[in-house]
């Protein structure tokens, strides 16, 4: 396999607006009132990077983005900037 080839794992995730999501356990969602399904792509070749993998979703209550954190494998939505998102995810 070529070293430059990127391996990818894809997870199906159900997440609630504003919540932190663990794609490894899929927990924290039994109380959700608004749920959305999304695809989370985990790029093994980028262990410390975070990038947005889904475009914004316009709803009656605002704009949302999905981000992947390959180091911690966590996802959140309802944030305007990557900086804000990084500040919210700690450890």
Question: Where are the model-predicted features located?
Answer:
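A short, exposed loop/beta-hairpin motif centered on an aromatic-Gly-Thr core
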Residues: 18-33
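Short aromatic-glycine-(Arg/Gly/Cys) micro-motifs in beta-strand/loop hairpins
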Residues: 2-22
């Amino acid at each position: 396999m070529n070293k430059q080839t990127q391996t990818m794992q894809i997870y199906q995730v159900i997440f609630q607006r504003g919540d932190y999501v663990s794609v490894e356990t899929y927990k924290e969602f039994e109380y959700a009132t608004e749920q959305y399904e999304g695809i989370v792509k985990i790029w093994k070749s980028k262990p410390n990077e975070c990038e947005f993998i889904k475009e914004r979703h316009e709803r009656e209550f605002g704009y949302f983005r999905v981000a992947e954190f390959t180091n911690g494998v966590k996802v959140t939505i309802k944030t305007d900037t990557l900086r804000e998102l990084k500040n919210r995810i700690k450890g």
